Curated annotation (Swiss-Prot):
This is Lactoyl-CoA dehydratase subunit alpha. Binds 1 [4Fe-4S] cluster. PANTHER family: 2-HYDROXYGLUTARYL-COA DEHYDRATASE, D-COMPONENT-RELATED (PTHR30548), SUBUNIT OF OXYGEN-SENSITIVE 2-HYDROXYISOCAPROYL-COA DEHYDRATASE (PTHR30548:SF4). It is an enzyme of class 4 (lyase). Involved in the acrylate pathway for the conversion of D-lactic acid to propionic acid. Catalyzes the reversible dehydration of Lactoyl-CoA and 2-hydroxybutyroyl-CoA to acryloyl-CoA and crotonyl-CoA, respectively. The gene is lcdA. It comes from Anaerotignum propionicum.
């Protein structure tokens, strides 16, 4: 009997999150390779080669959500990493320094012993991709330099125009082949193209069920609380090329569909307004942001951030052009016009009444674009919006009082618009 038989989706999420970390620890103990990977770098290549995967962004988000970010940020501060650098990167570099010290001295530093961070091993290689930001290049370059390990970089050009030209897909496919060649050298064996096809098929099954979950937000009232996407996205990031994600997402999507048929909704009849959240979650204050909106009877039914992992492609395409397109069409890797169109589509599908824009100190790419994006979208659909200050992992930047004041104003504007439309 399977250990997961009879588990609900929430239980599966916790089980497989822990198992992914355990897999990496066991692989390290057996002398097998462990890779630290950027969140939207293709995992398909490493999984095909049997390399255990750890995702520093997800790991840092978990540390932030468990209120442990400050200890790691202080370690990074002492190493000279400026507060203006990405806090995911600073948390991860702090954690890496602690692991490195433990490996050298044989003694875990106190800050690591007391940390709520998930226990993951040091990497034997790192792989990064600049399809979400260029900060990842220097971050992973530093990891590789500090640990004296290989760094594989997959270069994905920014899309200044849409649609994506064929020459861009061809270039990215060449980047994929180059990464595969590097892995063959590192692993000392040839790439298994038959297994690669199986891994791509698995990835597409995971993405399919992930999209089933996101689709549930279109119903009114919604059976899906949009904040749940932030929780479940750990597996679409870290395990999309494993059946861990498929099993969990299928269970959650099935549960949501059953609830919809039974008339069971996320807010149990208390849903009054619907909003879009644009940007990364404020992980150290995730509970506050959710509860504040729920207390105002406002439900999140739109967010583009988890949709970054809507990485559907043709697994039968041996040229890898389809896969290349999937990894480059991510909305924050495209021009402002396309970003606006993506957000407008999400807002329409989710039947939202307004938007919360997270001006994230860490994520300059998303935050700087959001100022202009917000105005363009308001001109197009007339829906109100507010901006809130915060950070994805550094708890010091977010002000609960500011958040509460601004979202209350947003809800008042949304309710006024609804009353005027009646």
């Amino acid at each position: 009997m399977s250990l997961t038989q009879g588990m609900k989706a929430k239980q599966l999420l916790a089980y497989f999150q822990g198992k992914a970390d355990q897999d990496a620890r066991e692989a390290k103990a057996r002398g097998e390779l462990v890779c630290w990977s950027a969140s939207v770098a293709p995992p398909e290549f490493c999984v095909t080669m049997g390399i255990a995967m750890i995702y520093p962004e997800t790991h840092a988000a978990g540390i932030g959500a468990r209120k442990g970010a400050m200890d790691m940020l202080e370690v990074a501060d002492r190493k000279g990493y400026n507060v203006d650098c990405c806090s995911y990167g600073r948390v991860n570099m702090g954690y890496m320094e602690c692991l490195k010290e433990a490996a050298i001295t044989g003694v875990k530093p106190e800050v690591l012993v007391n940390s709520p961070a998930a226990d993951v091993p040091l990497p034997d290689l790192v792989i990064t991709c600049n399809n979400i930001c260029n900060t990842l290049l220097k971050w992973y370059e530093n990891l590789a330099a500090e640990l004296d390990i290989p760094c594989i970089v997959i270069d994905v050009p920014f899309n200044h125009t849409m649609p994506i030209p064929e020459y861009a897909k061809a270039y990215i496919a060449d980047q994929f082949r180059n990464a595969i060649s590097q892995l063959e050298v590192i692993c000392g064996r040839p790439f298994d193209w038959k297994k690669f096809k199986e891994v791509k098929d698995q990835t597409q099954r995971s993405v399919y069920h992930w999209n089933r979950i996101a689709e549930m937000a279109k119903y009114k009232p919604s059976p899906l609380n949009g904040f749940d996407l932030f929780n479940y996205m750990a597996l679409i990031v870290a395990c999309r090329s494993l059946d861990y994600a498929e099993i969990t997402f299928k269970a959650f999507a099935d549960e949501l569909e059953e609830n919809l048929k039974a008339g069971i909704y996320a807010f149990k009849g208390a849903e009054k307004t619907r909003f879009q959240w644009e940007g990364i979650a404020v992980w150290p204050h995730l509970g506050h942001t959710f509860k504040s909106m729920k207390n105002l009877n406002s439900i999140m039914t739109g967010t583009a951030y988890p949709a970054l992992w809507d990485l559907h492609y043709d697994a039968n395409d041996e040229s890898m052009h389809s896969m290349a397109e999937a990894y480059t069409r991510i909305y924050i890797n495209t021009c402002l016009q396309n970003k606006v169109e993506v957000l407008l589509g999400i807002m329409e599908k989710g039947q939202v009444d307004g938007t919360v824009y997270h001006l994230n100190r860490s994520c300059k790419l998303m935050s700087f674009l959001n100022v202009e994006t917000a105005e363009i979208i308001k001109e197009k659909n007339g829906l109100p919006y507010v901006s809130i200050d915060g950070d994805q992992t550094d708890p010091r930047v977010f002000s609960p009082a500011q958040f509460d004041t601004r979202v209350q104003a947003l809800v008042e504007m949304m309710e006024a618009n609804m009353a005027a439309a009646e």
